[in-house]
Each structure stands twice: as C-alpha cells, then as structure tokens.
Amino acid sequence: MAFRIASSPYTHNRRSTSRIMLLVLIATLPGIAAQWYYFGWGNIIQVLIASVAALVAEAAILHLRKQPLAETLKDNSALLTALLLGVSIPSLAPWWMVTIGTVFAIIISKQLYGGLGQNPFNPAMVGYVVLVISFPVQMTSWLPPVGLQGITPSFADTLSMIFHLHTLDGHTMQQLQVGIDGISQATPLDHFKTGLRAGHSAEQLLAQPTYSGVIAGIGWQWVNVGFLLGGVFLLFTRCIRWHIPVSFIASLAFFATLGWLLSPQSLVTPMIHLFSGATMLGAFFIATDPVTASTTNKGRLLYGVLIGLLTWLIRSYGGYPDGLAFAVLLANICVPLIDYYTQPRVYGHRKGK
C-alpha cells in the first residue's frame, strides 16, 4: 500500500485575519459604551463616518492597483483602523476631519506601502497625528462628561454639530464646552497640565469638579476601564500577547510615579496617567498591532517600555496633552533595531564575528 505524504504546513490555524480583527472590534465595545454614556453619540457617529471613508478609500486604491476587492475588504483591517481613529478624536469634530485622517491612514500609511502587513507605521496613529498637527484646536475640543455639561446635546444636536458646526438650537462648540461651573472643559490630562502651568497646585486641581470623587477624571477613568476589560478579553482569547501591554503600563506607571514623587507640584499624578487619555486603548489595541510592533518576546517588552517612557515624556514636557500616538510612531521607527538585537539564538550556527 502506498502512502502519500502531504506537503507542509502540517498544522492549520483556523483563525484567519478577518476573525482576529473581528474579535478586536468586539473587544472595543465596553470602551465605546463608556464613551457613549459619558460623552454622548459623537464618537459612534465618528466611527461610522470613518468606516465609510476607510472602505471607500481602500476599495479605490485596490481598484487602481488591480487587486481583488472582496477578499481584502473582508479582512476587517480597514474597519479597525477607522474605529481606532473614530474613538480617538473629539466626539463633535467636523465630519471632514475624521474623513481626512482616515483617508490619509488608509492610502498613505497603509496602501502606499503595499497593503496589510507591509506598513511600517500604525495607520490609525498616522492619521491621528496628521489631524493633531493640522488642526490642533479642533483636536483638543472635547465635551465635558455627563454631569458637568452645561448643555447636553441630543442625538440630533450631535449630528448637526458634526455636519453643520452648530446644534439645532444654534449652540456652537465653544458654548457646549463650557461646563456647569462656567469653566471651559478639556481632557483631564490637558486640564491638569494647563492648571499647573497657570500656577495652581495639584491639590487645588484635584479638588475641582472634574476630579471630584474619582481617580482620573469623571468619565475618562471608566472609558479606560472599558478598554482595559476589552484588553483582558483579547488576552483571554489569545488575540494578543501580554508582553507589550504589561510592559507599557508598567513603564508608564514607573516613570509617572518617579516623576510625581520628585516633582508633585508640576507633574500629573500616576493614576491620571494610567486612567486618562488613551492609555488603555493604546496599551491593548494600538501598541499591540502585530504588523508594526516588535516580533520577538524580548523585543516586545522593550517596545512596550519605550512607548511608556515616550508617552510619559511627551505628556509631561511636550506640547500635546496625550503623547501616545507620537510615542507609538517613534517606537515603530525603532522596531527593526529592536528586532535585530533581540533575535533568539539559532543553535547549530556559529555566531558571526
């Protein structure tokens, strides 16, 4: 009896790219739900606009490159890029901003390099940085959370604000940003940094309504908890490995604690660093991008530490309130060097001189 030996590979991984991307999309739901509860419908609408822009941009480039449309569009990578960008920008940013950022992310940062798996930089963060540099005022115009809003926009008001720059009653973004205390609101990180530079003490800032009874700003801490829960889901389902999120969070916590102990009157507290801004979103959904992150276990640890350090430095001494996007892109640049020096030893080969 003759036996036929099948060719390799001899194992089959049932997890396709589209399935992994779908699980990541599902994992973002707790964080998005917290955003919706505290900040309204804005970010959900931004995600929908970004998704349409991403699919159209990807389809257009694939058509120009004469690549198969259906197979590529079904891998869900464009939708994930759109979602990450949609939840990262202010909820009432004009529709054309998220469209510009998404189109730039898909065409320039992804397809220009050959598509999924070829891009050296995280596409969503490239799109975000383009928007931050080009439209700094709009990209720092966040609504106060529920409970601190002087005017709470409805779903119809949110749509009108995004597409027409005013609510149905004629309120502008500047009016919506003013909280119940009559003070224009910002993210906890931005609010804290601005207050410190204005001469207020950390104790005075922490006593303000934004931080009343919470560890990192009303609303924002629960948004981060939501993305943390989603990250645990990704770890449990083995969609990501633990090295990058753990080393990133540990690094950020270490440097934030060290800086705060040395200069408590001029630097943000460690808990605000950990549970404000895009910390947990970055730790589990952005920094863990398998295409642009390090590929070795030691390299992943170094990569996470580097992002944590850069995030703390930019947040503490830079001109932007949340430096995560810049930190991730700078770490992306270092990935080839990190991988080169952290490759495991190959036995049976003499080490080159």
From Swiss-Prot:
It is found in: Cell inner membrane. It is a multi-pass membrane protein. The chain crosses the membrane at residues 20-40, 44-64, 77-108, 123-143, 214-234, 242-262, 267-287, 301-318. The modification FMN phosphoryl threonine is found at residue 187. Pfam families: NQR2_RnfD_RnfE. Its EC number is 7.-.-.-. Disulfide bonds: none annotated. Its cofactor is FMN. It comes from the Bacteria. The complex is composed of six subunits: RnfA, RnfB, RnfC, RnfD, RnfE and RnfG. Belongs to the NqrB/RnfD family. This is Ion-translocating oxidoreductase complex subunit D. It comes from Erwinia tasmaniensis (strain DSM 17950 / CFBP 7177 / CIP 109463 / NCPPB 4357 / Et1/99). The lineage of its organism: Bacteria, Pseudomonadati, Pseudomonadota, Gammaproteobacteria, Enterobacterales. The gene is rnfD.
